[in-house]
Structure formats: structure tokens, C-alpha cells
């Protein structure tokens, strides 16, 4: 017999990194308490506007979305393309800060929204799954932080030549660091 969570959402939803290690009880609680909802968007439809205060992070289930900046003259810069399984707006939802970017559907897309306001409350004495959810969110945010750091390292040099050298040397530096770490642990 299918659980409530599996009956409402496809099994792939709960295999996403955000829900890794969440018990069946936790998944059922997420669904029954209304923490999750899905919404479909057409190409170029705005999901979040700059200045919005949001309480839900989004996870792309199908299609893709752009995180973009639009300047005063209407020039649009795409900062990131979010593909299926990836999370967006988690920092704004968690910190309750106004969005500094727009989020727009790059193509017909389906997004799972997860309401973070509920995460501040405990669930009927069984909050082990909430702790796991917080840990998963932290892991996702830290991975994004590392990606941003790498992007900053690559764009900080002044010339294109220096940027390319930094970009190409990163894997070599990482491999050298890992080899040194391994030798140190022997």
C-alpha cells in the first residue's frame, strides 16, 4: 500500500538531496501539513520578482529556471540556470530577506515549493526528520557556497589570461591537495 507522501508526490521527489534520510513519518508529515506544493510555469513566466519576500524555497522538478538580474535600463543578466533537482531561493526564504534577483522559467517547468516557515516549529514531538531536513539544507547551502567561491576565484584576476590560468589550475591544485592530505593521513 502506498503511503500518503507517495500517493501525492512521485517517488522521485523524495529521492532529491533535500529529502535524503527523511523517514516515512517525516515525508507523511511534510505532505499532510501542507509544507509542500507544486506549481507549473510557462516559458518566461516569472516565479519570483526582485523585492519579493519569500517563505518558500523552490526545487525544479522538470524544465529549468533562470536566476537573473535586471538593471535599471532593462538589461538582463543570467546569473544561474537551475535544472531538475536543484534548489533556488533557499537563502531568501530562510533569512526572510527581499529577493535581489528575479527567478524566471527558462522553459515550461514544474517547481516543488517547500515552505520554510514551518521548519521553525516542531512537529508533534517527533522532530528527528526536521533535524535531518535542516542538515540537508545546510549541506546544499554549503555546496552552493563552494561553487560561488570557485566562481569568485576565477573572476577575481584582472586579465582573461589570468582567469583562464586560475580556472585551468583549479583541478590540479585540488588533486595536489588531496594527494598531500592522503600522505599526511598515512
Where are the predicted features?
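Cyclic nucleotide-binding regulatory module and flanking cytosolic helices
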Residues: 1-43, 88, 92-93
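N-terminal positioning helix adjacent to the helix-turn-helix/winged-helix DNA-binding module
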Residues: 133, 156, 160-163, 167
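Basic, amphipathic alpha-helical hairpins
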Residues: 122-127, 148, 171-174
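Phosphate-/nucleic-acid-contacting segments
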Residues: 160, 167-184
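Amphipathic, well-packed alpha-helical segments that form the structural scaffold of globular domains
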Residues: 31, 35, 142, 146, ...
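Cyclic nucleotide-binding regulatory domains
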Residues: 45-107
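Cyclic-nucleotide recognition modules
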Residues: 34, 79-139
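Long, low-complexity, charged/polar intrinsically disordered regions in eukaryotic proteins
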Residues: 134-146, 150
Amino acid at each position: 500500500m502506498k503511503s500518503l507522501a507517495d500517493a501525492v508526490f512521485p517517488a522521485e521527489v523524495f529521492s532529491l538531496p533535500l529529502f535524503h534520510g527523511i523517514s516515512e513519518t517525516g515525508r507523511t508529515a511534510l505532505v499532510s501539513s501542507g509544507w509542500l506544493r507544486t506549481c507549473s510555469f510557462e516559458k518566461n513566466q516569472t516565479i519570483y520578482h526582485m523585492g519579493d519576500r519569500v517563505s518558500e524555497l523552490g526545487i525544479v522538478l522538470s524544465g529549468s529556471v533562470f536566476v537573473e538580474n535586471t538593471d535599471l535600463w532593462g538589461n538582463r543578466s543570467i546569473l544561474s540556470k537551475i535544472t531538475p533537482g536543484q534548489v533556488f531561493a533557499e537563502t531568501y526564504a530562510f533569512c526572510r530577506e527581499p529577493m535581489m534577483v528575479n527567478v524566471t522559467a527558462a522553459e515550461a517547468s514544474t517547481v516543488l515549493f517547500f515552505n520554510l516557515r514551518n521548519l521553525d516549529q516542531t512537529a508533534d514531538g517527533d522532530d528527528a526528520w526536521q533535524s535531518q531536513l535542516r542538515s540537508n539544507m545546510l549541506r546544499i547551502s554549503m555546496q552552493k557556497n563552494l561553487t560561488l567561491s570557485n566562481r569568485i576565484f576565477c573572476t577575481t584576476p584582472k586579465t582573461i589570461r589570468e582567469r583562464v590560468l586560475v580556472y585551468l589550475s583549479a583541478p590540479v591544485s585540488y588533486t595536489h591537495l588531496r594527494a598531500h592530505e592522503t600522505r599526511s593521513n598515512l
